A protein has these predicted regions:
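Catalytic toxin/effector domains delivered as secreted proteins or via bacterial secretion systems
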Residues: 1-76
Length: 76
């Protein structure tokens, strides 16, 4: 069972947290206007995942505090 929580959607970029019992290190999924990738608690793509596009990076930087809070909330 997986639950999705949209953290932000801006300029075609979505950042979601998907929670399940076997989901690994805390992160959020980043989609739209670039590759499907993930962002970890350090603000960077998770190891082995694609780099952010310029548009994705702008949205992540602008919304970093709420993204980080969303990741922490769902991975307590």
């Amino acid at each position: 069972l997986v639950h999705n929580k949209r953290i932000t959607k801006e300029n075609g970029v979505r950042v979601d947290v998907r929670t399940s019992n076997e989901h690994g290190l805390p992160h959020a999924h980043v989609t739209g206007n670039g590759p499907n990738t993930t962002v970890g608690l350090d603000g960077n793509p998770m190891r082995g995942h694609p780099a952010f596009s310029k548009q994705q990076l702008r949205v992540i930087k602008k919304n970093w505090e709420i993204i980080k809070e969303g990741i922490m909330l769902w991975f307590k």
